[in-house]
């Protein structure tokens, strides 16, 4: 079963996220697990308009590969990356690719919750969005759950300890991202925050991820 919804190192049971050139290498090398492909907001700082267009074309092409099960990570970062306009252009283009191929969009959000939620409304997005590394508080988590169906919140090594309990159980995911901790230890920390039975978060998050991807017609259990 897939349990780790976001990492940067291919592994069985994990979705590794990378830029187009990285994902192309993983596919060629037969790396394990499944993949998401996208233009990280940090990368937009170094991209000319022509380079951004070329990268978006690569994302669109790779998005149709069977082992690429999601788009991103894409999003907004107020602390790092290109201009607001360039980040927005890259994000909206990737959100539209996700809609076109019917695969989830993985979000990178730093100090910009409002812009992401406004984009969800404006696009009338139909595919799920996975908010990777969610560090918002319980009030923000509850607002997202209440007002924005289709958004899943994923918790990594660092998170607001009150937030997981505010997430609808069916929308909770876990990830390693760049942490050295294994996914079961991260899930155990979320267990403690939720006051749940040890091991239950990992099982819940795995079932949620399988259902999320299966609902989009992608079945990573068929991947290596």
Which stretches of residues belong to each language-model region?
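Mid-domain alpha/beta scaffold segments of enzyme catalytic cores
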Residues: 1-224
